[in-house]
């Protein structure tokens, strides 16, 4: 019996060693995929239209909704385009507060245009009929 148990233990050790070798062989293949630095770079976009939903902004206090909506537009443009500076068109700000300072619109369609290196202009997108 003792010989049988030692033989099974040796077989188990061999199989575990083979499994470890297989795992080590697979690790370098996974490491050669995209790195964090490659993921951080955003693709360059010249002109782009997007719809921003202000649901998060509307949830909060009434008196600061306009300010938060403008900040949220900046945040979304920075997030999608990798911009450092975002310029908001006054017409867009007026469209957000069309119903009043406390009752902002639910969503707005904006057109984003690149005007410099990492500088973008966010303006109201007007549908052509």
From Swiss-Prot:
The entry's keywords: Ribonucleoprotein, Ribosomal protein
Any GO BP: translation
Biased composition annotated in UniProt, kind: Basic and acidic residues: 9-27, 35-46
Residue ranges of the region described as Disordered: 1-46
Gene Ontology molecular function, alphabetical: structural constituent of ribosome
Keyword flag Transmembrane helix: no
Pfam families: Ribosomal_L31e
Gene Ontology CC annotations of this record: ribonucleoprotein complex; ribosome
Signal sequence coordinates: none
Family: Belongs to the eukaryotic ribosomal protein eL31 family.
Annotated protein name in UniProt: Large ribosomal subunit protein eL31
Species, as recorded: Sulfolobus acidocaldarius (strain ATCC 33909 / DSM 639 / JCM 8929 / NBRC 15157 / NCIMB 11770)
Gene (UniProt): rpl31e
């Amino acid at each position: 019996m003792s010989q049988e148990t030692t033989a099974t233990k040796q077989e188990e050790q061999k199989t575990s060693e083979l499994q470890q070798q297989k795992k080590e062989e697979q690790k370098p293949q996974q490491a050669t995929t995209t790195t964090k630095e490659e993921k951080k770079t955003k693709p360059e976009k010249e002109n782009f239209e997007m719809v921003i939903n202000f649901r998060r902004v509307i949830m909060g206090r009434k008196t600061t909704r306009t300010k938060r909506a403008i900040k949220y537009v900046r945040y979304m443009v920075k997030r999608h385009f990798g911009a450092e500076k975002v310029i908001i068109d006054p017409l867009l700000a007026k469209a957000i507060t069309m119903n009043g300072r406390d009752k902002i619109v639910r969503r707005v369609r904006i057109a984003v245009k690149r005007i410099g290196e990492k500088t973008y202009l966010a303006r109201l997108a007007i549908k052509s009929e």
